[in-house]
Amino acid sequence: MVSYTVLLQRLRAQLHINGHLVGVAAGSGMTGTYAMMGGADFLLALSSGRYRIMGRGSYAGYYCYGSSNDITMELGTRELLPILPDAPILFGLAASDPFIHLYEYLKEIKARGFSGVANFPTIALIDGQFRLALEEDGNVYEREVEALALAHHLGLFTVAFVTREEEAEAMLRAGVDVICVHLGLTKGGFMGAKKYISIAEAQQICDRIFSLCVRMRPEAIRMIYAGPANTPLDVDYLYRHTPAQGYIGGSTFDRIPAEQAILHTIRAFKNAGRSGVSETFATEAHAPDAVDFVKQYVHEHYGREIRLRDLAIVLHVSPSYLSTRFKQETGMSFTAFLLSYRMERARALLEEGRLSCKEVAARSGYLDYAQFSKMFRKYQGVSPRDIRSSEINTSRNP
């Protein structure tokens, strides 16, 4: 077990050195082991993670197929804690469980070796008539707030999943250590959500909630969970446009990588020795999601001329389909995304101070400096020379 003080010190140090944190909702001991080897800052034992490893959807943790708390306790004590005794592992607590006494159960969680608690499954993800019926029966979000307040009192690290400002405010007043904006089920893969908000909508939600956090308790760590953000590029976008300090993933780290690795490996073995076929299947198996492919291509080649119709040909889809799909997932047109990305990268290069304004323009895909300056001012609110001059003055007068 990692103590509260030690864990908080570790996370603060990581934020200072690396700038961001990564939490992993591990559904098995194997996932947890490799997550920690990869540099995860903490693990979460959640019943939904266990169901994912069984090949079921994450929301299975919300139904009465079994006791969520019992499933989580077994996952943590039989798989995660024995092989990762020095890792910070958080317990996903179903606070509305009618068969537990919150205070006594939290003491048991701590005694079994867990370093902290998160409110999951959370009623925050339920709405409509079913939510009203649950609340009439006493299953309210305030119960989760109470649970994390008690956990904090007992010296457990606390992660609060929230979906709107009112929930974040209540959790901040309860003294939680992390506010994590839950953006819904993770998109992608065979079992991923087919309906989800765009990355631009996610940005707006995070910005509202995190702005509240900064005003109320700036020391509280601000993180994001899942939804449309399932690639490093998505998370990088949210880091650049919101005050987010970290990312927690479940399917992103255990289901999607496992789906891809198993599928690709079996196909490769299935077609081993079949001349001329292996390459075809390998290419098909590794074909990325169209929108992810476009975003990755922009990331790697933003300084070149990029046309959506050319990318559509490579992906074997129509330009109109790719354009519509891209806007649905990102909340912006391809042209707006490309321009925004180019201007963000240009600003970063200008702030580094090693290149002239014209050199930065050329690296950003602009041979006409006047056009580059015009677009930069439109997207960044200042001219390239203003940024460059500011960096020169800063270096001369540290």
Protein language model regions, located:
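Terminal helix-turn-helix DNA-binding modules in bacterial transcription factors
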Residues: 296, 328-365, 389-398
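Catalytic cores of alpha/beta
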Residues: 29-37, 100-108, 165-174, 227-244
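C-terminal helical cap(s) of enzyme catalytic domains, especially alpha/beta-barrels
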Residues: 55-63, 191-202, 253-280
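…primarily DNA-binding HTH/wHTH and HhH modules…
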Residues: 374-398
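N-terminal amphipathic alpha-helix/helix-capping segment at the start of soluble metabolic enzymes
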Residues: 1-25, 77-86
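Active-site beta->alpha loop and helix N-cap motifs at the rims of alpha/beta catalytic domains
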Residues: 31, 38, 42, 58-141
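Glycine-rich phosphate-binding active-site loops on the catalytic face of alpha/beta enzymes
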Residues: 42-54, 116-127, 178-192, 242-263
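Basic/polar phosphate-binding segments, predominantly the helix-turn-helix DNA-binding elements
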Residues: 308-338, 361-383
